[in-house]
Amino acid sequence: MAVNNEVNNAASETPTDVSSSSQKLATEETALTNGADHEEEDGGEAGGEVFQLTVVLPREPHKIQIIVSSQEAIHDVRQSIIELPGTFQYSCFHLEHKGERINDFVQISEVPGLTADSEIHLVEDPYTEKEARIHIIRVRELIGAAGDRTDTLNGIISGASLLDSVTSKESSQNGTSTAPSHPMVGFDFQGSGNLSTLLPRAQEPGPKTVKSISVSPWNPPPYHLRQKGHLLYLQVTTNEGEQFQITSHVSGFYVNKSSTGKFDPSPKSAPKAHSAHSLLALLSDLSPSFEESFKGLQEYNNAKEPLATFQITNATPSNPWIVPSATAPLVAHQADITRTQENYLIAGIENSETLRDWNEEFQSTRELPKDTVQDRVFRERLTSKLFADYNDAAARGAILVARGEIAPLNPTEGKDAQIFVYNNVFFSFGADGVGTFASEGGDEAARAAVGKDVMGVRMVNQLDIDGLFTPGTVVVDYLGKRIVGQSIVPGIFKQRDPGENQIDYGAVDGKDIVASDEKFVSVFEKLSKALKVKKHAVWDKDAKRHDLEGSIETKGLLGTDGRKYVLDLYRVTPLDITWMEEVGTALDSPKEADAASESAYPHRMTVIRPELVEAYWKVKMREWVNGELERKRQAQKAVEPAAEGKEIEAATEASEPAKSEEPTENGELAKKSESDEAAEPSKPDQERIDIGDFKFALNPDAFSGQQPQTDEEKTEFAEDEQQVRLVCEFLRKTVLPELVKDLKEGDVGFPMDGQSLSRLLHKRGINLRYLGQVATLADGKRLESLRILAVQEMVSRAFKHVAGNYLRYLPIPLTSSCIAHLLNCLLGTDLNAAPKPDVDEAIAALYPEADLKFKEVTPESLKQEIEGQVLRRFRYTLDSTWTAGIKHLQLLREVSLKLGIQLEMKPYHFTKQSQTESAAAPPATNGEATKEAAPTGKSTNGKKKKKNAREASPAAVVSANAASPVTFNPDDILNTVPVIKEASPRSSLAEEALEAGRISLLQDQKKLGQELLLESLSLHEQIYGILHPEVARVYNSLSMLYYQLDEKEAAMELARKAVIVSERTLGVDNAETLLNYLNLGLIAHASGETKLALTYIKHALDLWKVVYGPNHPDSITTINNAAVMLQHLKEYHDSRTWFEASLKICEEVYGKHSINAATLLFQLAQALALDQDSKSAVNRMRESYNIFLTELGAEDKNTKEAEKWLEQLTQNAVSIAKHAKDVQARRNRGIRVSPRVTLGQTQVQPQIGQTVEAAAGRDTPRGLDSRSIDELLKFIEGSDQSNQNKKRPGRSNPKRRGGAAATAGK
């Protein structure tokens, strides 16, 4: 395993000590080179002493100093040396101290006599073949000679970042004489999305250091020369055009006498003899221009944001759905002979180095000690890397299975029943190939089960129960096929003796036989307790009773390695009986006989979500606590009534896990950290309640066909079923209405696309099958956006299922034709009402057995199929005109992301009008962001600039001018990528430190809080690596916390990192990325870089147009913020325009007479005064006053404030306007917007579903907060003399949002 990790490290450009960079940026304290730990959150174990070491080198610069921690491993120090600019020519060496070799895997503290200012010596080692290959790969990457790697998994420009492009565009505009005064000039609020927003700008290539470097045709060395130490032969062509044949020898590298036609690998004689231990040094000797060009390449690379260039090793890179054309400079295919040799260089001749025993690695990692903090860091770090490696390998294998590249182990079985083994991963299809789910819904049930199994495995991995093991599990959706990849559990294929069960715990062969091996009771008991599963009875086919700790479907297997494995975790929660009875899939349901009908729900695997169980448990627990308090109160008459609040709080604190701001997808909340508990003030005994007496658990086998035998069993089972029914009713009667109410009142962050809507529903414990009910509940103007989004999500999911049916058994070369035709039938009917499929008949003839039924699809038949799927899956009837109301671009994005489609970036014409309008328009550029690439849907951005014709690629010219009769052609589908579901656990240690830091800040322990936050940052970076979604979320969370602490420089740096990492791992147009851009803009404005801030906000608004379209409810406050920033730049007239735009959206969403509109009218009136439009200012203030008077009454503070302003404006409008200008600078110190105006998602837009108060860093109740108007009045009157750089009050601070770094809405 270590061997493979070294190969991976060597092949990666990611420095291991990058974590220190963020520590240096986040604080002025001394940072640790390799991310050494700060004082730990439990106060028990320090991160180790930090000191400086001197490393003595064999060549210049002869000595370097590095900062290390006594707790670091020597291996980490070694890796740091490899990555430092002055020493990266070294890769094959060991370290010595006082002449003694130091073991790479011991900690620094374990090396005798190694203290501060000690000297260690770097000693070059003889190469092995493997070390030589690693060295060559590394040098190729360092000198820029490595082309793009062959990648069968990740798509075109995967892991791209746009931040450099966004920033450089603003810089380039500022450098011109005709530059606009600010980035918002000419912004079209109602314009359609511009696809070029999603692509990075084309960049000039870096300087070439050598023409080529590759493995020589003479490679590998013959036997007799291997005996003499020859390892590899290379061929190098320098920039001067000279070609050299180089021998890689155990002693280093030297130029040999071979030529293209003659083999003589002996060293050349003087004066042409050149040799060196490092290939980098040898190239410098051979090429006079190498040094200068290599220096230029380093400068070129240093000009880029480092995070945007590092290889992503611990996460799956994001795959954009819009990509440059195949001929664009960003993706142009280059000749590189070594690309075909890379597998050999990485894995050797036998290719055996990449074969890993995944199961053994998973389980041995789980068995690592976790007693100390250092143990936990090492264990979680290894776990994170292992899951990333496995997910990558399993996804690659799944694609090969889907493409038919791997032979099945059982070729005589039906296609869906075939199984495969590749790269030590076991693959099967997510279909009911052998009839296991025949009674549950067949293929549809099997497909749902494997998806839920991944979620169950992730939950168990997160719980980390000693002695219980799970196989590595990944589900891959690719071109309509669902493929499951699992690590091979020892003994799972073992033939059992007669009478011996294949499974040791749970159901065997359906549910006829039930195994209940006592060995599994203890571990399953822990699992069930954590998942709130009740121990219950089940009965086999002979009516024999078995008491199981978990669901009968959850199986235990004793592996031949002696470990206890838990399998089939798709039923860890009970069935949603209310839904099943409604749709007729419940057992004994009168509708069940019609289950095969077109309108019947497709399967019976409709379980409730773990988050719902968690939410219901909290409700019941609070009820129980209140009951216990009442009982105590009756028993202790001396207790004061005022203590009740404290008692409830104490009980809640004692009973609930730490309030991590976001339940995970599997519903498990982060554990409360020890610091958290330590920080709590001690409570009197009488105020505490032992919640150990509170019992709540659900029977997951309720309503699943169990047959109790005795009356007592029947009574208990009926009680279990009633408890499950209550949970289902809680979902419908409480959770769903509360969510809709929160969104209606603007109290939480509003979703902006299907992914964020799904995440919000899941976080609340709502299954996506309730999208139809969400759409039905979204009644009225205020919830129109939610209804449109829910309908769009149902349509896109229905299209995914329809397309999957056509794609599943289609040969790969015909899939582009199928996808293009289906997209034309869905989105291109306004341009062509009867599109014809474009199929290459010559290719189709090669597959006589292929099912080409997609050719028969028409827009009408597709519409009917989608309506049928929406009705079946969501119980929602689309109205007859739904196709007229779809948002073309947004729906295209949704279906592309769900199917993994990568489309060429070009103007897509959805209507005849748009095609006519853009017929004369110049073509889109290859990867540069320009207005011309706007897809032409129902609205277009009319402001177009002339293009330089030389920027356009030939392919783009043809596609733009060809006047195609259809919207999509097969050539537009450039690639399809897999959609991956995986089971990686999150780091509990890093989350504990983050939560402890946040709690310390809330308790005004600023120094301790900052130390813990830095500790959490260091842990996140160490455990996940720097490029990971969880790290992006902690960067964003910490940037907001530092922003509130007035640490603007640190906040800015962290916010930039949050943007880049989320772009590269979540997507350039992901909702979290968009929100990160908005936060970055706010922090940039607070740091005095208002023009740059407006650039970021403009980019976010451009993304919004693509993701949602114009007029998103959350954009009200974003536009309002931009208006205030424009005031800061003294652009009063433009600022007024932006306030008016914000008001217009607010009136559309909330109504003209809403309090939100009144507050915006109040601000607009001030903006009009600044713009010297006194008459309009008076009118707007009067409107504001009238609304406040009607809605809140004459005595309300807001009404009085508006009345006061109205009087002042009316009495002396000119004087007020002048006065307002005088205090404008003070006013712009902070962006102050009423919380009702911000709708719960503004300067600190919540991570979809976060409350306004939590986001703004305050704990006030919901409702209109008159302080914002009061404070604004003080600003305008000049009574607040704060300077611009003073810290913002907590209430106007941005929301903390994002994944593990946001406070979830209750």
UniProtKB/Swiss-Prot annotation:
Residue spans of biased composition, Basic residues class: 1285-1298
UniProt keyword Transcription, yes or no: no
Record-level Gene Ontology MF annotations: mRNA binding
Biased composition (Polar residues): 12-33
Main location: cytoplasm
Gene Ontology annotations for the cellular component aspect, listed alphabetically: cytoplasm
Keywords of the record: Cytoplasm, Repeat, TPR repeat
S-S pairs: none
Transport found in the keyword field: no
Compositional bias ranges of the Low complexity kind: 1-11
Similarity-based family: Belongs to the CLU family.
Protein name: Clustered mitochondria protein homolog
Species, as recorded: Botryotinia fuckeliana (strain B05.10) (Noble rot fungus)
Gene behind this protein: clu1
